[in-house]
Amino acid sequence: MFDTKALQAEQRQRASEISLHDGIDNQFVRFIAGADVGFEQHGEITRAAIAILRYPSLALVEYQVARVATSLPYIPGLLSFREYPALLAAWAQLQQRPDLILVDGQGIAHPRRLGVASHFGLLVDVPTIGVAKSRLCGDFLPLHQDVGAVQPLFDNDEQLGWVWRSKIRCNPLFISPGHRVSVGSALAWVQRCMAGYRLPEPTRWADAIASNRPQFQRWLRKNPDFLGKRRDMI
């Protein structure tokens, strides 16, 4: 059994350490990472991927994958405890450290203000942004169907982030700061990382690698000599 109350208390404590002030010097951002987690063997293995893209070209320069035994079952609201061990293992393998990380998941748009983007950002002390595919908490006004439509995401009077339609006929993204990024800058950075898909390029790559998707396998076959990979980890 897991002490969920103790983990929730830890979340509240760590959330108090989150900074929503920009820790990014826009003129000196050279590398942006995407981070995502998938699961193998019916959830027994956590597979984390971190993709490093050069900015502003958004060209992939490195990726790392780590597999670790899953230490926590799926518990709503405590997902970051399940995911961060594998993320830290992938982080430790990186040759190029990023200036900013976009994480597939929530930042402060979380009932206790500590989604995986915030938790991971605190642990590695790098600016992070949560880019989630669904809402965990907060309310927003109806969103127009046009590309670029945006509404603030609020919990009572506190703005947690943004709801942004990045692609037509697609569900919106839920964007919130993780750590060392302001609410306003979170949306702007995600918008700078788009390349015509629903997801920004950093998390689109990380999602494909973490889940070992067919498009990633096709890319591997076309790029067998890519220097940024760790072939033994795939």
Curated annotation (Swiss-Prot):
Classification via PANTHER family: ENDONUCLEASE V (PTHR28511:SF1)
Designated name of the protein: Endonuclease V
Catalytic activity: Endonucleolytic cleavage at apurinic or apyrimidinic sites to products with a 5'-phosphate
GO cellular component, one term: cytoplasm
Entries under InterPro entries matching the protein: Endonuclease-V
Binding positions for Mg(2+) per the UniProt entry: D36, D104
Enzyme class: hydrolase
Keywords per UniProt: Cytoplasm, DNA damage, DNA repair, Endonuclease, Hydrolase, Magnesium, Metal-binding, Nuclease
Domain of life: Bacteria
Names of required cofactors: Mg(2+)
Compartments it resides in: Cytoplasm
Family: Belongs to the endonuclease V family.
Gene Ontology BP terms: DNA repair
Chain's gene name: nfi
